[in-house]
Amino acid sequence: MPRSLKKGPFVDDHLLKKVDVQNEKNTKQVIKTWSRRSTIIPDFIGHTFAVHDGRKHVPVFVTESMVGHKLGEFAPTRTFKGHIKDDRKSKRR
């Protein structure tokens, strides 16, 4: 179920402060974060976040089309290696 509109989007305070500081200084450094649950707001457009996927930090450059989504949606936590091919010749012998 989506979040109530009267509450507004959830963004961690420390993340919002880091973005505000960079906007004041007009710098665009990578912001390292573990907050996958934070919603992307219009203030984040143009910034790069290093979102933790459980193992490493994945760089995510925020564009207009990402607004309203969560940061964790753009840093997958599982790597799919593919299914193993079924080798029938070796099973028969």
Swiss-Prot record:
GO terms for biological process: ribosomal small subunit assembly; translation. GO terms for cellular component: cytoplasm; small ribosomal subunit. Signal peptide: none annotated. Keywords: Ribonucleoprotein, Ribosomal protein, RNA-binding, rRNA-binding. The keyword Chaperone does not apply. Pfam families: Ribosomal_S19. InterPro entries: Ribosomal_uS19, Ribosomal_uS19_bac-type, Ribosomal_uS19_CS, Ribosomal_uS19_SF. GO terms for molecular function: rRNA binding; structural constituent of ribosome. The keyword Nucleotide-binding does not apply. HAMAP family: Ribosomal_uS19. Belongs to the universal ribosomal protein uS19 family. NCBIfam families: rpsS_bact. Protein S19 forms a complex with S13 that binds strongly to the 16S ribosomal RNA. This is Small ribosomal subunit protein uS19. It comes from Mycobacterium marinum (strain ATCC BAA-535 / M). The lineage of its organism: Bacteria, Bacillati, Actinomycetota, Actinomycetes, Mycobacteriales.
